[in-house]
Design a protein with these regions (language model features):
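Extracytoplasmic copper-binding redox domains, predominantly the cupredoxin/blue-copper superfamily
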Residues: 2-119
Length: 119
């Protein structure tokens, strides 16, 4: 009987992890309630996103390596920067002005993305 219970527990945990992973992999939907960028495989996905003024974008780190979301360029930062995000860590920012916002990962400056904010 203990073996059945153990197998059931493993199965239940597997279903839970699969469900959480599926939710976390949801990416941005223009005009949707949640605009999300996944950080995985040392890249931002989607790499470019268009939202309306007032939209909040959330970045979620799917990698097991720490990443940041740092606005501006590595050489010319703008001051908006997430803390180092661990696995499944997230950072959200609400865009209040139209424009094009570029961002990168400080530890991995080749990782870049942009958010276009339309009025």
């Amino acid at each position: 009987m203990e073996r059945k219970e153990a197998l059931f527990a493993v199965f239940a945990v597997g279903l839970f992890v699969a469900g959480v992973t599926a939710l976390a992999y949801r990416t941005a939907t223009p005009g949707g309630a949640l605009d999300q960028v996944a950080i995985r495989h040392y890249a931002f996905s989607p790499g470019s996103l268009t939202v309306q003024v007032g939209a909040t974008v959330r970045w979620v780190n799917m990698d097991f390596v720490g990443h940041t979301v740092s606005f501006g360029t590595h050489e010319d930062p703008t001051g908006v920067e997430s803390p180092l995000l661990g696995h499944m860590g997230s950072f959200a920012y609400t865009f209040t002005e139209p424009g094009t916002y570029t961002y990168h990962c400080d530890p991995h400056p080749y990782m870049t993305g942009s958010v276009v904010v339309a009025s």
